[in-house]
Amino acid sequence: MNIAVLGYGTVGSGVVEVLTTNRETITKRAGEAIDVKYVLDLRDFPGDPIQEKIVHDYQVILDDPEIKIVVEVMGGVEPAYTFVKKALQAGKSVSTSNKELVAKHGAELLALADEKNVNFLFEASVGGGIPIIRPLNQSLTADEIDEITGILNGTTNYMLTKMDTSGADYDAVLKEAQDKGYAERHPEADVEGYDACRKIAILTSLAYGMQVDYEDIHTEGITHITETDFKYAKAMNMGIKLLGTSRREEDGLFALVAPRSEERRVGKECRSRWSPYH
């Protein structure tokens, strides 16, 4: 089976590497070999074996009947949305890790995939390697979900844990996270809560069967959390986590991303409450 990968950045190159390194195992599980025929990118990569597969014109991929699956790892809404929509319209299945795209246009793209009898898959957009999308789509379809709450961003969870355990301030912990590669040089998507917001929008849309625009969800990040906040939290035997939550209410849905104070786990019981750190 021939596939095309859209984007050859950190994620795209990782996809190609995994498919190459684990080729034998993947072939056994898939029942056939999966070959990367094209990689779409604006850049060239002289000296890299991938260069022979690089294309700059997306139409080449659309017009090739051998391409059955398009893997979109470009990030952002555009041009990813346009490219994914065209792939589905051309009868090609799409797999994406693009949480912003799924949160904004997921319902439309799922409907289009169903109409064209192909797949639009986005398990990697939420939870990394934790399977959550498929259970919501398949295993829990007969259940009525009342609430979803979780830690949806690993970077901020690492930072808050370090602030809690070491007493370090926000700036010091952010620099450490960046030095270790846990946080980007421009970390706004993580620390302002935007990443978690897009993820809770995706989960909410799937759980409750309606499109939820992440721009409508009130979102607060962790940039205002201080050492003093942790001192007060510890005095109450609480910790602080950035949580995304959504729940069904009588007049619709409630969704929020914000720091939340959570009672430290004792035995099997754990209680939480909304944080006053606004």
PLM features per residue range, with description:
Residues 75-77, 153, 260-262:
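Short glycine-rich anion-binding loops that position phosphate/pyrophosphate groups of nucleotides
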Residues 81-86, 99-127, 133-136:
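Rossmann-fold NAD(P)-binding glycine/threonine-rich loop
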